[in-house]
Regions:
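An amphipathic, aromatic/His-enriched active-site/gating alpha helix that lines ligand/cofactor pockets
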Residues: 25-28, 59, 63-71, 86, ...
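Hydrophobic pocket/interface hotspot
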Residues: 37, 49, 91, 101
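Short, solvent-exposed mixed-charge patches
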Residues: 146-147
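Acidic/histidine-rich, surface-exposed loop or edge segments in extracytoplasmic proteins
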Residues: 29-44, 89
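Short beta-strand/turn micro-motifs at beta-sheet edges
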Residues: 23-27, 77-80
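Bacterial N-terminal signal peptides
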Residues: 7-20
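N-terminal, post-signal-peptide region of Sec/Tat-exported proteins
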Residues: 42-90
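Positively charged n-region of N-terminal signal peptides that target proteins for export
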Residues: 1-4
Length: 147
């Protein structure tokens, strides 16, 4: 019975270690992970949105960058909307790997609450932001390079 349990444990360990090896592609190398958020900012509110990004997003994500949780962040605009509710601003956040996303999720709340002054102030700012912008979609993508 002990041999069977030992064998099962070893098999489980080999499967756990071997899984990443199987996940490697012969076609590309894995790169960083990107989260892209597509936002629709209401007409006439774009300046308020950009000011919010400058006052809140940038200082927080610059600190996250210092902490090593993100590699970079970028903003994109959509010059050709397909319909009135289409996105007009996209925010892209680059993470070194999936693990840094988990690490950041666990630790960033403290920094975020400190920036806003309190948890309630953070919630109030999010409610205010929701008055002039809507998150259309949030996507995760792994950057890859061809071999």
């Amino acid at each position: 019975m002990r041999k069977m349990v030992l064998w099962l444990c070893l098999t489980a360990m080999l499967l756990a270690v071997g899984t990443p090896l199987v996940a490697q592609s012969p076609n590309f190398n894995n790169g960083p992970v990107w989260r892209v958020m597509y936002v629709n900012v209401k007409t006439g509110m774009i300046d308020q949105y950009w000011n919010d990004l400058k006052q809140n997003f940038r200082p927080l994500y610059d600190e996250y960058k210092k902490q090593g949780w993100i590699v970079d962040y970028k903003f994109y605009t959509n010059p050709v909307a397909e319909h009135p509710d289409d996105w007009n601003v996209a925010l892209a956040i680059e993470y070194k790997n999936w693990g840094t996303m988990d690490e950041m999720a666990e630790k960033a709340t403290t920094i975020t609450e400190k920036h806003y002054g309190s948890h309630q102030a953070m919630v109030d700012a999010a409610k205010k932001r929701a008055e002039y912008s809507t998150l259309i979609r949030s996507s995760l993508a792994r950057e890859v390079t061809l071999k």
